[in-house]
């Protein structure tokens, strides 16, 4: 399985979230709401998640092996580094501050 498209929107927020991302896999399946997060050791790609009733975050889609995780990370970060435009995002949720780094 290959990442065949990355759509990325850098955003300006007070939190650690730096971009919202959608990826296409094998030109056949789209995953929305990935995020580029500023962690303690640098930027990383967080998978789409939802808050559970106990306040924790749980991924709703994620790779099941390290090779696919690395492919997603590499593809997203390549586009992130190539994107200059930053959009102020008034609707960004501050939930990114509770993500683990």
From Swiss-Prot:
Keywords assigned: Cell cycle, Cell division, Septation
HAMAP family (alphabetical): SpoVG
Q: Which family does it belong to?
A: Belongs to the SpoVG family.
Protein name according to UniProt: Putative septation protein SpoVG
Report any one BP term from Gene Ontology: sporulation resulting in formation of a cellular spore
Under the heading InterPro entries, the entry gives: SpoVG, SpoVG_sf
Q: Which organism is it from?
A: Staphylococcus saprophyticus subsp. saprophyticus (strain ATCC 15305 / DSM 20229 / NCIMB 8711 / NCTC 7292 / S-41)
Lineage, top-rank taxon, reads Bacteria
NCBIfam families for this protein: PRK13259.1
Any idea what job this protein has?
Could be involved in septation.
Gene symbol of the encoding locus: spoVG
Looking at the keywords, is Cell cycle present?
Answer: yes
């Amino acid at each position: 399985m290959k990442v065949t498209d990355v759509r990325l929107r850098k955003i300006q927020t007070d939190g650690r979230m730096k971009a919202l991302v959608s990826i296409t896999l094998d030109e056949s399946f789209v995953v929305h709401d990935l995020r580029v997060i500023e962690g303690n050791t640098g930027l990383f790609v967080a998978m789409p998640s939802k808050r559970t009733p106990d306040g924790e975050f749980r991924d709703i889609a994620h790779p099941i092996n390290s090779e696919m995780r690395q492919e997603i990370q590499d593809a997203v970060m390549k586009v992130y580094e190539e994107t200059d435009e930053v959009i102020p995002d008034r609707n960004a949720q501050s939930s990114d501050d509770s993500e683990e780094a």
